[in-house]
């Protein structure tokens, strides 16, 4: 790797710490910033700090919020009787892009993982139990990831929440729309068979 | 697109202004910053400003420099009699990774483009002529891009500099190493034929 002037080398290193950014992308980004107007660089620089300083977690659902309560929990048009449980705040983005779900959310900030020492106490489950205790919630849709940790979390939540009198459902698993059976692994295909629907 | 809290939406917008970063990548980067330690966010934020504030152009070759003279011009191990002319500072990176070139550089900061109104006066050509006037330069290697603008710039430089008594050469064009003839366009193939070498 050639020598860059120190501030440029440092910016490249910082960009490389971001996910999906390798040496070449980091160089391209750094040279872009170098060519950009100082004003634009300032905006980016400030936006990075503001995200850390001005955002907190919603007191109800633990989603990212710029106030005490996030925009989904404070939206009275959304149905409080259906709560979709996700692992991370960015999972909400994917669900919102469907424009299908009109309920509320609950963010666990992780998934159970005995291997990595993540137990139920380290997830934001207590708040979910409290929300259900208030009696408004009718259904909990568990939208944790379809992997070992997400599945374990889903099973744990089902056992914990069903006795409280709520319906606990799991998002459907199967072949992605637009994909090809050829590319699906056997576990996905067997889930798709299990989850078949009458036409 | 779902609604993000304002600081997060702003950071996503700022990331999207960077080259090669679309909506999805910008979201991933922004959520990464959100999860990162404040210290790490500060380092990135500061590095962006430092690149604008602490770097200038080398007084000799117009490369990026954190002092008055860049590291290549101040390196006495490098041969001052061979000068490689490039369009942009980041082009030097590609040449340096070969570890083959031991001469000096000259950065034009652009290429001639009548269509976009870029004439010779807008490129840093004057300094190059002055360097040659000092008598130390023996060969100028024109490593501008192999496209219309870069080629026009190369032809212009050759006409301008040859009368000053220096050898002006152009980097070789042909089939990229590791590629396949099948994927090469006809102009590249004809350049490769022209540039053939006896074995």
Swiss-Prot record, chains A, B:
Chain positions of all zinc fingers (C4-type): 58-73
Pfam family, one: Toprim_4
Any one GO BP annotation for this protein: DNA repair
Domain Toprim: 81-176
Xref: InterPro entries: DNA_Rcmb_RecR (IPR000093), Rcmb_RecR (IPR023627), Rcmb_RecR_Znf (IPR015967), TOPRIM_dom (IPR006171), TOPRIM_RecR (IPR034137)
Superkingdom to which the source organism belongs: Bacteria
Single Gene Ontology MF annotation: DNA binding
Gene3D superfamilies recorded: 3.40.1360.10, 6.10.250.240, RecR Domain 1
Family annotation (CDD domains): TOPRIM_recR
Keywords: DNA damage, DNA recombination, DNA repair, Metal-binding, Zinc, Zinc-finger
SMART domains: TOPRIM
Function comment: May play a role in DNA repair. It seems to be involved in an RecBC-independent recombinational process of DNA repair. It may act with RecF and RecO.
PANTHER family, alphabetized: RECOMBINATION PROTEIN RECR (PTHR30446:SF0)
HAMAP family, per database record: RecR (MF_00017)
Family affiliation: Belongs to the RecR family.
Protein name: Recombination protein RecR
Organism: Solibacter usitatus (strain Ellin6076)
Gene: recR
């Amino acid at each position: 790797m050639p020598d860059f002037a120190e501030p440029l080398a440092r910016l490249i290193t910082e960009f490389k710490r971001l996910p999906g950014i390798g040496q070449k992308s980091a160089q391209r980004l750094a040279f872009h910033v170098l060519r950009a107007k100082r004003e634009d660089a300032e905006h980016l620089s400030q936006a990075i700090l503001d995200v850390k300083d001005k955002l907190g977690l919603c007191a109800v659902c633990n989603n990212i919020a710029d106030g005490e309560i996030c925009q989904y929990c404070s939206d009275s048009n959304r149905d409080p009787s259906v709560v979709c449980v996700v692992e991370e705040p960015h999972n909400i983005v994917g669900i919102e892009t469907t424009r299908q779900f009109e309920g509320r959310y609950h963010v666990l900030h992780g998934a159970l993982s005995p291997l990595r020492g993540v137990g139920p106490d380290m997830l934001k489950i207590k708040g979910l139990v409290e929300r259900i205790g208030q009696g408004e919630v009718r259904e909990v849709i568990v939208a944790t990831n379809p992997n070992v940790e997400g599945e374990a979390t889903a099973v744990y939540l089902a056992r914990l929440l069903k006795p409280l009198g709520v319906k606990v459902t799991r998002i459907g698993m199967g072949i992605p729309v637009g994909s090809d059976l050829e590319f699906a692994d056997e576990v996905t295909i067997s889930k798709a068979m299990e989850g078949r629907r009458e036409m």
